A protein has these predicted regions:
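Short, well-ordered alpha-helix to beta-strand connector turns
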Residues: 3, 60, 101, 156-157, ...
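Mg2+-dependent phosphoryl-transfer enzymes with acidic/Ser/Thr/Gly-rich catalytic loops
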Residues: 1-5, 21-22, 197-278
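Asp-based phosphoryl-transfer active-site loop
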Residues: 4-18, 93
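Conserved acidic, metal-coordinating active-site core of Asp-based
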Residues: 96, 102-103, 107-227
Length: 278
């Protein structure tokens, strides 16, 4: 069957190592859109963190955010699917991991939130400067993150714990954070590929959201293609009719994908779209 919809991860997939959308990749996306293919950015970022390069691209109407916890219709500026976490358990988890060497974040609705102390810690993270700047610009600061989460009308779409590293480059406190998180059966967690864990309701996944959007649009699983590089892309790579892994992807992702393409610094996502969808 012909490909009618493509779910695309951003960091490490559509964007190169400098967090840029190349002119060639943009051209291929525009060709796909002109051919009637539904292009769906699928990211761990919140709605407010969707880069303008994609949010403003003509023909991109839908986006999957926070690892599949929500789907937004950009044209109508509304959420058309959401699965949020339990508020009380989320606040408790944040309190229990607060003393660890991490940068905490909570995504409620379209926004990401953090405390000022964690905003100051961003500089200590082992990230490229473009990603640090994205974190600084896309988070709202609250005085007490667990209390903020508890006081909202609904639970967060996602929590994130980003690990500080020791002199040897090893994540500090990651094992303890994973141990604590593992005690919450109602949650699942994955790595976003940047030295972190991303925590969602156990029913959440990019693949689940992609299939739900396909259902709403009348698109079958066999007509859906997904491209990604990290553990948080596994759900859609495995559930789509055609799952594509980037050459720079994590080993487990490359093993589970149907096919491989070039790296994000080689316009690999564009090459896959050309080969399998155009």
């Amino acid at each position: 069957m012909a490909i009618r919809m493509i779910g695309l991860d951003l960091d490490g997939t559509l964007f190169n190592s400098r967090k840029q959308l190349t002119a060639h990749t943009r051209q291929i996306l525009e060709r796909a859109i002109a051919g009637g293919i539904v292009i769906v950015p699928a990211t761990g970022r919140p709605r407010s963190g969707l880069p303008a390069a994609l949010a403003d691209m003509e023909g991109i109407r839908y986006t999957i955010v926070t690892n599949g916890a929500a789907v937004y219709d950009l044209e109508e500026d509304r959420c058309i699917y959401e699965k949020y976490m339990d508020r009380e358990a989320s606040a408790e988890l944040l309190r229990r991991t607060r003393g660890l060497q991490t940068v905490q974040g909570a995504f409620v609705g379209p926004w990401g939130y953090m405390e000022e102390i964690d905003r100051q810690r961003i500089e200590q993270l082992s990230l490229v400067e473009e990603m640090k700047q994205y974190l600084r610009s896309s988070r709202k600061v609250v005085e007490d993150l667990p209390a903020f989460v508890l006081g909202e009308a609904r639970g967060p779409q996602k929590l994130v714990l980003m690990f500080l590293k020791d002199r040897e480059g090893r994540p500090i406190d990651s094992e303890e954070a994973i141990r604590i998180t593992g005690e919450y059966a109602q949650f699942s967690f994955v790595s976003g590929g940047v030295g972190n864990i991303e925590i969602m309701d156990s029913a959440v996944g990019k693949g689940t959201a992609l299939l739900e959007l396909g259902r709403q649009l009348g698109i079958e699983r066999e007509e859906i293609m997904a491209i990604g590089d990290s553990e948080n892309d596994m759900d859609m790579i495995c559930k789509a009719g055609l799952g594509v892994a980037m050459a720079n992807g994590e080993e487990i992702v490359r093993r589970r994908a149907d096919v491989l393409t070039g790296s994000n610094d080689e316009d690999g996502a564009a090459a896959a779209i050309e080969q399998y969808a155009l």
